[in-house]
Structure formats: structure tokens, C-alpha cells
A protein has these predicted regions:
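A short, GP-enriched loop/loop-strand-helix hinge that lies immediately N-terminal to
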Residues: 1-29, 42-51
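General beta-strand structural signal in soluble alpha/beta enzymes
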Residues: 17-20, 47-50, 68-72, 83, ...
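Short, charged, surface-exposed secondary-structure boundary motifs
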Residues: 26-32, 145-146
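Conserved anion/nucleotide-ligand pocket segment
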Residues: 65-86, 224
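Internal nucleotide-binding/catalytic subdomain
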Residues: 80-221
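Active-site "cap" helix and flanking loop/linker of ATP-utilizing ligase/carboxylase catalytic domains
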Residues: 174-196, 213-285, 296
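Generic C-terminus detector
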Residues: 293-297, 302-348
Length: 348
């Protein structure tokens, strides 16, 4: 909706709106736009080339190093990124995107980019033109399988804070990524308002931007919000009025962990319309976030690939992880599955 101009439309009707303009939302809406923007404003990112036809893209596969990364240019529900170990896999990815149109119009153009080594982290902030309030750091798990293997998904779980983003790295991301992005968008005539999510790869103390999202991430939002003690609504209102300096962030010092409960088959064709059963757990430090569910005849039914995010707080990440899986086990439906290692990078 943001890429389609929802924020612009609401503001044109005099409605207070928290969210970037159609022009600014291109940071997420087009990977080619975002990569070109990174280069223009000196924001560190992987080397890349973009293509709008199959044959030219396929010819480029002869000159890239493997593994390489093939990305659908547009919005693809978090599934448009394919890591390819060799030329055959990359060629198949291009065929799926261009010829089979797996991602529809999002695949009218592709970006082929260098594969980056390192550890990913999510850096989410509220931005209002030239002002910024960083939120708690987090790390998600995109691959469907334990140990980060298998197909990419929208995210199978997340935890907060992310130990890899220490104080030095936090400042480095602000200085090298967020500040240049804010200033660059102002320079482009599209000052930013809303959540700005930078997915970064960190390796040997250096960073590169993988992607931008113009929204809270899912499933990072759930563990982050479980730790936020100050008002999210007030934060958004201050951003709309360009008064972020008045906001005082307050965070729970505990760690949080969120585990996605998914439907059998996800991230490909998945089982749906299954009745969900719950065992009651009463705890202020746990929260079951619904995602792919509907209510039919007073019964909760599954309706999506990612169905719930079981999220919990703990004195440390291990305790938060244990509590989150306790909550996972209180939910059951036919075909339910989850990764059993969410948070492992932060516990190692």
C-alpha cells in the first residue's frame, strides 16, 4: 500500500498519517532503486547488476562468482531472494522469476548481487525527516530449516537485542547507513516519515546493507514490542509532528525471543483451514501474536503460511528462548511446525 501511495492519499485528505510517501517507499518497493540509491549516497552494499530480460541476465551468470544472490526487484512477501550455489541454480532462479513469473510483476526486473559472508542483524528506527529514534536491535532467521538451511521465508523467528550489534556497531550503522539515507531522501525531495528497517550483514567489524524495508519487520516486531515499555502511539505522533526529540524511549532490560509457528509446506504451497487448539498459559512475560488465522464459528482456523509468533521475555536469551518454546507447545493444529533453534546465534 505504501508503494501504491497510501500515505500520500491519506495526507491529501487531511488525515494524520505515519508512513513514508510513495516516492520514499521505493527504498523497499524496488531493489534496483535502493541499490542505485546506496551507491549514489555512499552507503555500503554488495556489488550488483540489474536486468529486465531473461537472456541478458542469464549471460551475466557466466561472469559472477558463486554463490551469488538473485533477487526479484519488487515486493515478494520476503521470499524473492534466492541464494544460488552454482550457475545451474542461478539459471533456474532466473527462469522461475522471468519465465514462470513466480513473483508476478515483482519479477519484471531482477538484481543479481554478490553473496556476502557474515551475520545478519535488523536495525529498525523511527525516522521523521532529519530526526531519528532507533528501536531495540534484533536478529531474525529467514531460512525455513534449523541451522539456517533451506528456502528463504518471511522469517521463522527473531530475538532482541542482537549481541552482534554492540555499542560501536550501533553507532556505525547510524553514521554509515541511517544518517546518509535520511539526508539522501531529503536531497531527493522525498523526506522520510515512518519505520525504516535496515537489514545489514556484519563481518569482521564491517557492515553492508542487504535491504531496506519501509515498515516494521515480521517477526522482529514481536520481540521488539514485547520489550518496549514507552508508548508506541506517542512515538508515532511525535514523528508525524517532527518532534522526535521529545520522545523518551524506555525498554525492558530483559531479552525476548519470538518463534514462528508455520503451516506444513510453507514457504511453498501450504496446508490451511486447520482448527487450532490452545492450552491456557497465564504469564505477563509471554504473548502469542496471531498472523495467519481467522475466526469461524467461534473456532480459530489457520489461513496463512506463518500462523503465530510465540514470543516471551527472559532474564537472558536462553531463558527467553525456553519460555517461547513453552508457549509454542501450548498451540496445536494439523501440520504445525517451527524451527527448534531460534536464537542460537545469540546463545553460542
Amino acid at each position: 500500500p505504501l508503494v501504491d501511495g497510501l500515505s500520500d492519499f491519506l495526507q491529501s485528505k487531511g488525515i494524520k498519517t505515519f508512513g513514508p510517501s510513495q516516492a520514499a517507499a521505493q527504498l523497499e518497493g524496488s531493489k534496483t532503486f535502493s541499490k542505485d540509491f546506496f551507491i549514489k549516497y555512499g552507503i555500503p552494499t554488495a556489488g550488483y547488476s540489474s536486468f529486465d530480460d531473461f537472456e541478458t541476465a542469464k549471460a551475466h551468470l557466466e561472469v559472477v562468482d558463486y554463490p551469488t544472490v538473485v533477487k526479484a526487484d519488487g515486493l515478494a512477501a520476503g521470499k524473492g531472494v534466492i541464494i544460488c550455489g552454482n550457475k545451474d541454480e542461478a539459471s533456474e532462479a532466473l527462469k522461475n522469476i522471468f519465465q514462470d513469473q513466480t513473483f508476478g510483476e515483482a519479477g519484471n526486473r531482477v538484481v543479481i548481487e554478490d553473496f556476502l559472508q557474515g551475520e545478519e542483524a535488523s536495525f529498525i528506527a523511527v525516522v521523521s525527516k532529519d530526526k531519528i529514534v532507533p528501536l531495540a536491535t534484533s536478529q531474525d532467521h529467514k531460512a525455513v530449516g534449523e541451522g539456517d538451511v533451506g528456502l528463504n521465508t518471511g522469517g521463522m523467528g527473531a530475538y532482541s537485542p542482537a549481541p552482534i550489534v554492540d555499542a560501536r556497531m550501533h553507532q556505525k550503522i547510524l553514521d554509515e547507513v541511517m544518517e546518509p539515507t535520511m539526508k539522501g531522501l531529503i536531497n531527493e525531495g522525498s523526506p522520510y516519515l515512518g519505520f525504516l528497517y535496515a537489514g545489514v550483514m556484519i563481518h569482521n567489524g564491517e557492515l553492508k546493507v542487504l535491504e531496506f524495508n519501509c515498515r516494521f519487520g515480521d517477526p522482529e516486531t514481536q520481540p521488539i514490542l514485547l520489550r518496549l515499555k514507552s508508548s508506541l502511539v506517542q512515538l508515532c505522533l511525535y514523528a508525524i509532528d517532527n518532534k522526535l526529540e521529545l520522545y523518551e524511549s524506555e525498554w525492558d532490560k530483559r531479552h525476548s525471543c519470538g518463534v514462528v509457528i508455520a503451516s506444513e509446506g510453507y514457504p511453498e504451497k501450504y496446508l490451511s483451514n486447520q482448527e487450532v487448539e490452545f492450552q491456557e498459559l497465564h504469564s505477563d512475560s509471554m504473548k502469542l501474536f496471531h498472523a495467519g488465522t481467522t475466526l469461524e464459528n467461534n473456532k480459530v482456523m489457520t489461513s496463512g503460511g506463518r500462523v503465530f509468533c510465540a514470543t516471551a521475555l527472559g532474564a537472558n536469551l536462553k531463558e527467553a528462548q525456553t519460555a517461547a518454546y513453552t508457549l509454542v507447545h501450548s498451540v496445536s493444529f494439523n501440520g504445525a511446525f517451527c524451527r527448534t533453534d531460534i536464537g542460537y546465534k545469540g546463545i553460542k
